Regions:
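Bacterial Sec-dependent N-terminal signal peptides
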Residues: 1-37
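Beta-strand-rich, non-transmembrane domain signature
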Residues: 35-208
């Protein structure tokens, strides 16, 4: 069973963001923040979040993601769960996970076969579904790392959102997002609530 439908919906909503338009390469990343600012009132900390979108054509792309989160207390557990929304155009190709204890020792490897799969609703006529993993570890702090790859085919109308801070009382050490597009293909994006958030945006072409 899924502990929090609200948490799942937040993960799903992140995918509902479209880009189209005018660039070759778009990079976004958080700037360095003092450790005391990161940990202040935090229940969890994103140690590193990395998203790389490789757009092969107007209809095909590969999204490679890596997420490392340290959970500081029980209130931060929701941030440690894994969710990946899929549909007839998006499919989860690769996945691996790892739980690391406070001493830096790997205590568990998580395989793709351990993920749960669920439809959004049996009453809806939709091909949408998602994979999830409910991460639990008895002592705090602990760290969980996920790496996964999603293939998008024949239905590419937008890309994932860049939301470094997904939960309240969550610190962010490092987060990056990069989109690479074929020559002649562009990308349009919109920034929301980035003022004062120490986020940089870089657009480049060719080998820049």
């Amino acid at each position: 069973m899924i502990r929090s439908n609200h948490s799942i919906l937040k993960q799903i909503i992140r995918r509902a963001f479209s880009l189209s338009g005018v660039l070759i390469c778009l990079s976004l990343h958080t700037q360095t923040v003092r450790a005391q600012d990161i940990l202040k009132d935090a229940n969890s900390v994103i140690v590193e979040a990395r998203t790389e979108v490789l757009c092969k054509s107007m209809t095909q792309s590969i999204e490679k993601e890596s997420l490392t989160i340290t959970v500081l207390n029980h209130k931060g557990l929701d941030a440690a769960h894994f969710f990946c929304g899929c549909d007839m155009f998006r499919s989860l190709q690769k996945f691996s996970g790892e739980i690391i204890n406070a001493g830096g020792q790997s205590v568990r490897k998580i395989k793709k076969s351990e993920l749960q799969k669920s439809e959004y609703s049996s009453s809806l006529s939709t091909d949408d579904y998602f994979y999830y993993y409910e991460c639990n570890y008895p002592t705090f702090p602990f760290t969980v790392k996920y790496e996964w790859e999603v293939k998008c085919n024949n239905g590419l109308i937008g890309y994932s959102t860049f939301i470094p801070q997904a939960y309240l009382n969550q610190g962010v050490e490092k987060a990056t997002y990069r989109i690479e597009l074929p020559a002649g293909q562009g990308c349009r994006y919109r920034e929301l609530n980035t003022q004062g958030k120490k986020i940089q945006v870089k657009e480049s072409t060719g080998a820049d």
